[in-house]
Amino acid sequence: MKRIVQVKNVKIGEGIPKICVPIVGATSKEILDEAEKLKELTLDIVEWRVDFYEEVFDIEKVKDTLSKLTTTLNEVPLIFTFRNKIEGGEREIPIEYYLKLNLEVAKTKLVDLIDVELFIGDDLVKEIVEVAHDNDVKVIISNHDFFKTPCKEEIISRLIKMIQLNGDLPKIAVMPQCEIDVLTLLYATNEVKHKYPNNSIITMSMSGRGIISRIAGEIFGSCLTFGAAKKASAPGQIGVEELNSVLKVLHENI
């Protein structure tokens, strides 16, 4: 039986792929203003990309903004993400602070999911996963390659590793250098879908070349896609209303 990851009233892994929209404001005001505007859109989940937040090194300010953000979003599930620069993020932070930030946020129980980067190391990933689960927070274990698309076997290997580390939602995003790279990502996604049917996964091929991967998740096996409300947080993101329309057409004709 396929594993459904439920956050609030949203069931990730069931039916049509869910749409997540990132918030990338630099100040608390910008973040909360973005959240207000998102209420007008048809979306399922919001991701706070805290690496864009100028006060990210002040945990108390992070918690304060987080509290206000969850109040504004109300019943919309929230992903908390600090994306390191090497994986396409806005800035880099020391690994010790990355760990502390994620653990402290998990303990607030104000977020529904935390995104943890696979390559921070197994022990740190396990520690964050354990604390998050103890506080009823789900975990996305992720990997982003903004330079290339690894071979099919490597993509599959990374997704399996995320499953073995007890991630609720393994996620991989890769950069295609040609059309075949996009097919490689889709092939790997489909293979994991069939070999590990009990696990929901998130995959995407970035840039305009990889756009098919953002809309065809229901066919190949990716349960969540990212759309842009304003500023895209990754290359190739589609406007959320357009994304909704395309996903609906595909869903109704599969």
Curated annotation (Swiss-Prot):
Sorted UniProt keywords: Amino-acid biosynthesis, Aromatic amino acid biosynthesis, Lyase, Schiff base
Signal peptide: none
Positions annotated as active site in the UniProt record: H144, K171
Family annotation (InterPro entries): 3-dehydroquinate_DH_AS, Aldolase_TIM, DHquinase_I, Type-I_3-dehydroquinase
Keyword Transport appears in the UniProt entry: no
Binding site for 3-dehydroquinate: E47, W48, R49, R83, R214, S233, Q237
Pathway info: Metabolic intermediate biosynthesis; chorismate biosynthesis; chorismate from D-erythrose 4-phosphate and phosphoenolpyruvate: step 3/7
PROSITE patterns: DEHYDROQUINASE_I (PS01028)
A GO BP entry: chorismate biosynthetic process
EC number(s) on file: 4.2.1.10
GO molecular function terms attached to this record: 3-dehydroquinate dehydratase activity
Superkingdom as given in the UniProt entry: Bacteria
Catalytic reactions on record: 3-dehydroquinate = 3-dehydroshikimate + H2O
Subunit structure: Homodimer.
Family listed: Belongs to the type-I 3-dehydroquinase family.
NCBIfam families (UniProt xref): aroD
Known function: Involved in the third step of the chorismate pathway, which leads to the biosynthesis of aromatic amino acids. Catalyzes the cis-dehydration of 3-dehydroquinate (DHQ) and introduces the first double bond of the aromatic ring to yield 3-dehydroshikimate.
Protein name, entry field: 3-dehydroquinate dehydratase
Species assigned in the record: Clostridium botulinum (strain Eklund 17B / Type B)
Gene: aroD
